[in-house]
Regions:
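Active-site-proximal helices and loops of the catalytic beta/alpha 8
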Residues: 34-45, 52, 57-64, 68-69, ...
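Aromatic- and acidic-residue-enriched carbohydrate-binding clefts of CAZyme catalytic domains
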Residues: 39-42, 79-111, 146-149, 153-199
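Secretory targeting and sorting signals
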Residues: 1-31
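Short glycine-centered, acidic/aromatic-flanked micro-motifs in structured strand/loop junctions
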Residues: 47, 96-98, 228
Length: 273
């Protein structure tokens, strides 16, 4: 899959900033030893493509002692097979078993990080499922869930309310790749790099996705970085967030919520940050 170059650059910059922040903290602590109270700050580390066990160890050895407030981890849901970073952005179910670790390891990471005052932010993929990177016909995800990227059948997204999971009717009807970013409808209803585009206006899709967010919250996640939000209708994203907030019994505005929108003045006004 050819992900936009701007995303790769943004990730690299964010990672560099995170590393730079960590380098600076010990120096400050040495200069002001009386301030070593490890009070919760707003420092955030992006642990891009790090395993859950690695993050857990870093929380204990570095992030907690240095006063880091949040660690953002890569998408925790099951995805297509492969070691490339972008495979994490092609979900085949919302099971918390991924190439970065099992559900048990994910929950243990959160527990270990919380114990030293660090909260977890999850990178969340709601815009799409799989694209042309997977072979035709039936395939299996990293946790063994079957899906068919040719026909748009993803039974792994099943919930108690929707036991059939996701089918082709749960995606937008536009099957072409996005090419005209000045056309808001095309950007939000056609396919990003060939990936099936969720019909985010659908009550069913909103219910399944808000259930996933609630599952993350119940596992201990306390922040959400929403991927590719410029490709989701604003009203749909708001509805999903409100459904999620209702399910966990909190005010939607109180949730730590980050939306990825890469601005470009040449693109449609409705998809700008």
């Amino acid at each position: 899959m050819n992900r936009p170059a701007s995303r790769a650059v943004a990730i690299g910059v964010a990672a560099a900033m995170a590393c730079a922040t960590l380098v600076a903290v010990p120096h400050m602590a040495q200069a002001q030893p009386e301030a070593q109270t490890n009070a919760k700050k707003d420092v955030q580390v992006i642990a891009f493509q790090q395993t859950w066990n690695t993050v857990a160890k870093e929380c204990t050895s570095t992030y907690g002692p240095e006063g880091v407030a949040y660690v953002e981890v890569s998408p925790p849901q099951e995805s297509i097979q492969g070691t490339q970073w972008w495979t994490s952005y092609q979900p085949v179910s919302y099971k918390l078993d991924s190439k970065l670790g099992t559900e048990a390891e994910f929950k243990n990471m959160i527990k270990q990080c919380n114990a030293v005052g660090v909260d977890i932010i999850a990178d969340v993929v709601l815009n799409q499922t799989t694209g042309a990177d997977v072979a035709d016909g039936k395939q299996t995800g990293v946790a063994g869930t079957e899906y068919n990227g040719s026909t748009g059948d993803y039974p792994g997204f099943a919930t108690e309310q929707y036991p059939e999971g996701i089918t082709a009717s749960d995606f937008h009807s536009c099957s072409k790749n996005i090419s005209n970013y000045a056309n808001q409808q095309e950007v939000q209803e056609c396919r990003l790099s060939s990936m099936w585009d969720f019909d985010s206006e659908s009550e069913k899709v909103q219910d399944i996705q808000s259930d996933y967010l609630a599952a993350l919250w119940n596992a201990g996640v306390r922040g959400f970085r929403m991927d590719a939000v410029k490709h989701i209708h604003t009203d749909s994203m708001k509805a999903i967030k409100e459904k999620f907030a209702k399910k966990i019994g909190v005010n939607a505005d109180s949730i730590y919520w980050i939306q990825e929108v890469i601005g470009n003045s040449s693109e449609a006004a409705g998809i700008q940050p």
